[in-house]
């Protein structure tokens, strides 16, 4: 993978790199402009290629939901150089307050319903399942084996209810949800088929929703709400917390292995 400046030089058109927005163990994200359009660019770090995420798959999914206007419009991608550019969305972090809580939760549920009601493109990959398989291969012989087993066992238990998998975001947290007259979801790298309870639980966990607030969320979701009850979703919250730990351990191990190979 080329150095950052060399990767920038591969971008066609008039490109200007601006301030850093965020950094993670797998990527760096910056504000930028592309042909005078305000945009965001993400540069993958070496460890990104070792995860089960697939940038072409992310591009395909974003294109498939473009008309819903709930995600950024993609502008440019180069999988070889590990970069993607999408249009910047003006907005504020989605927050709940007493003045608008009911309508905000319903809007949040409605946006999630649009995703879950969208058909998954035939050529897309099952990123979530592939990620779980990768974590298993990485951790099953490590000191984190018990954490891994607890996480996977709970997932098997929760998904044994017969509910069909749907197109899911799989990474809904405060940093990935914006508000500007409507909800927008960002960072679709883990998107793909999954049990709908996972996304719902992610929102319950992120905003610490109580039982009444959970039902307000479901009133906006309105996709056979009888399938979900608060106790079930609470168990999904536990799973999401465990999965975050598994992800952190896995990424840390991959980063360590990458560093050791480089030295």
Indicate residue ranges for each PLM-predicted region.
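ATP/Mg2+ or Mg2+-diphosphate-binding catalytic cores
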Residues: 145-146, 246-263
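Active-site acidic catalytic loop and adjacent metal/ATP-binding pocket
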Residues: 25-33, 38-41, 155-198
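ATP-binding pocket architecture of kinase catalytic cores
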Residues: 22-123
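Active-site activation/catalytic loop segments of kinase-like enzymes and analogous catalytic loops
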Residues: 197-225, 238-254
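Conserved N-terminal boundary motif of the eukaryotic protein kinase catalytic domain
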Residues: 12-20
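Start-of-helix signal in alpha-solenoid helical-repeat scaffolds, especially tetratricopeptide repeats
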Residues: 231, 235-239
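An alpha-helical support segment within catalytic cores of ATP-dependent transferases
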Residues: 1-12, 118-170, 180, 219, ...
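Conserved protein kinase catalytic core
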Residues: 48, 93, 177, 193-195, ...
